[in-house]
């Protein structure tokens, strides 16, 4: 059994199918119908519980190759868990996977009702426990739990040292990931790792960019020096967890990179940090965008792209003073992409690599390659 307590006073008890223990975090909902392993292992969900709108989970099991990272969300909530999986690439059940990664699994709850609660109240803090089942004690645990905006989440998911990414994209012929081939690499880029998804790095390398992964706290002077010596051709600012406004030290370094006119691409958290670094602070959405079915309009082509998204924060409208808005979300008209006027920088809020989700925005990586050619 697992007991849940939400900050709005809601107390629930349900079945456990994951790890044992007690976890507190922010509760968000995800509307993806597949790809739960990639969602669970996305570093951007660090410190969060994910409730899936898809009522069934577990039918394809899990494997040792599709993880986005070594890190995981705090817990998973689903209407029904299926222990009997069927997939040629599966190595173990989802339950075994969650237990190995220390992730709580909750099933047998009315997820539709929970999602309506989040839609009405916004994201809520929650504590879940397979050990403590007293409502008052759970309330006390939650009261003392740090808010996600005050937690040093990025430092817990970033690489501790400079590394080279060794994998490229998935090969549907072999049903495995291609090894990175140095011969296909045309340029080297620095990846500022705030919690980068593996498939973003795969896609960068698939378009001919060798990815050198740097810690989140890397000094701008080090990257500027590498750029001036032509050791790197540009910089990618990755996705990651938490409130972007909490990363003040990193924002200060990014300001220097912008002033150095280094070509850059930002995705998700990276997109937000580029905005903040230029004096345009982000704001928090009521319940965020999480899922692989969000329509986004490309304002240049007028095409509507179905995108994968995972964020709770958004850049402000007045960023139009220094940037051309390139994409908008058709659910709420929030900004999804910009091209800066004052520097060779493009950034998007959604995830062009998807994983899970459609590949309709994959061209963003090729646009970055074209941007690098001009410098």
UniProtKB/Swiss-Prot annotation:
SMART domains: CPSase_sm_chain (SM01097)
Reactions this protein catalyses: hydrogencarbonate + L-glutamine + 2 ATP + H2O = carbamoyl phosphate + L-glutamate + 2 ADP + phosphate + 2 H(+)
GO process annotations (BP): 'de novo' pyrimidine nucleobase biosynthetic process; 'de novo' UMP biosynthetic process; glutamine metabolic process; L-arginine biosynthetic process
Enzyme class label: ligase
Role this protein plays: Small subunit of the glutamine-dependent carbamoyl phosphate synthetase (CPSase). CPSase catalyzes the formation of carbamoyl phosphate from the ammonia moiety of glutamine, carbonate, and phosphate donated by ATP, constituting the first step of 2 biosynthetic pathways, one leading to arginine and/or urea and the other to pyrimidine nucleotides. The small subunit (glutamine amidotransferase) binds and cleaves glutamine to supply the large subunit with the substrate ammonia.
Superkingdom of this protein's organism: Bacteria
Region annotated CPSase, chain positions: 1-184
Family the entry assigns: Belongs to the CarA family.
Quaternary structure (record): Composed of two chains; the small (or glutamine) chain promotes the hydrolysis of glutamine to ammonia, which is used by the large (or ammonia) chain to synthesize carbamoyl phosphate. Tetramer of heterodimers (alpha,beta)4.
CDD domains, per database record: GATase1_CPSase (cd01744)
Entry annotation: catalytic residues: 268, 351, 353
EC number(s) recorded for this UniProt protein: 6.3.5.5
Glutamine amidotransferase type-1 domain location: 188-375
Gene source species: Helicobacter pylori (strain ATCC 700392 / 26695) (Campylobacter pylori)
InterPro entries: Anth_synth/Amidotransfase (IPR050472), CarbamoylP_synth_ssu (IPR006274), CarbamoylP_synth_ssu_N (IPR002474), CarbP_synth_ssu_N_sf (IPR036480), Class_I_gatase-like (IPR029062), CPSase_GATase1 (IPR035686), GATASE (IPR017926)
UniProt keywords, alphabetically: Amino-acid biosynthesis, Arginine biosynthesis, ATP-binding, Glutamine amidotransferase, Ligase, Nucleotide-binding, Pyrimidine biosynthesis
Protein name: Carbamoyl phosphate synthase small chain
Pathways involved: Amino-acid biosynthesis; L-arginine biosynthesis; carbamoyl phosphate from bicarbonate: step 1/1; Pyrimidine metabolism; UMP biosynthesis via de novo pathway; (S)-dihydroorotate from bicarbonate: step 1/3
Positions of L-glutamine binding: 44, 240, 242, 269, 272, 310, 313
Gene Ontology molecular functions: ATP binding; carbamoyl-phosphate synthase (glutamine-hydrolyzing) activity; glutaminase activity
């Amino acid at each position: 059994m697992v007991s849940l307590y939400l900050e709005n006073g809601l107390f629930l008890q349900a079945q456990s199918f994951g790890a044992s223990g007690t976890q507190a975090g922010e509760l968000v909902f995800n509307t993806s119908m597949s790809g739960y392993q990639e969602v669970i292992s996305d570093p951007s969900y660090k410190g969060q519980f994910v409730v899936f709108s898809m009522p069934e989970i577990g039918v394809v099991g899990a494997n040792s190759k599709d993880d986005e990272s070594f890190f995981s969300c705090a817990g998973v909530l689903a209407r029904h868990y299926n222990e009997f999986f069927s997939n040629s690439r599966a190595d173990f059940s989802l339950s075994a996977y969650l237990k190995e990664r220390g992730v709580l699994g909750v099933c047998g709850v009315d997820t539709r009702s929970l999602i309506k609660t989040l839609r009405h109240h916004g994201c809520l803090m929650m504590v879940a426990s397979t050990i403590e089942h007293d409502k008052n004690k759970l309330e006390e645990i939650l009261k003392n739990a740090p808010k996600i905006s005050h937690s040093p989440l990025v430092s817990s998911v970033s690489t501790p040292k400079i590394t080279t990414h060794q994998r490229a994209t998935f090969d549907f012929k072999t049903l495995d990931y291609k090894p990175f081939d140095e011969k296909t690499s045309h340029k080297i880029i620095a990846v500022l790792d705030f919690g980068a998804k593996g498939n973003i790095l795969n896609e960068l390398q698939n378009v001919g960019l060798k990815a050198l992964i740097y810690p989140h706290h890397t000094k701008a002077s080090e990257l500027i020096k590498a750029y001036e010596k032509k050791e790197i051709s540009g910089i990618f600012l990755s996705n990651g967890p938490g409130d972007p406004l909490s990363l003040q030290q990193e924002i200060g370094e990014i300001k220097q990179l912008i002033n150095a006119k280094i070509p850059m691409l930002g995705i998700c958290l990276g997109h937000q940090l580029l905005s903040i670094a230029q004096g345009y602070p982000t704001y928090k959405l009521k319940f965020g965008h999480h899922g692989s079915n969000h329509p986004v309009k490309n304002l240049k082509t007028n095409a509507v792209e179905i995108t994968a998204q995972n964020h709770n924060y958004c850049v402000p409208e007045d960023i139009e003073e220094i940037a051309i808005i390139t994409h908008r979300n058709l659910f709420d008209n929030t900004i999804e992409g910009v091209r800066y006027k004052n520097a060779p920088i493009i950034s998007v809020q959604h995830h062009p690599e998807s994983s899970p989700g459609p590949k309709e925005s994959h061209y963003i990586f090729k646009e970055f390659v074209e941007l690098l050619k001009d410098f």
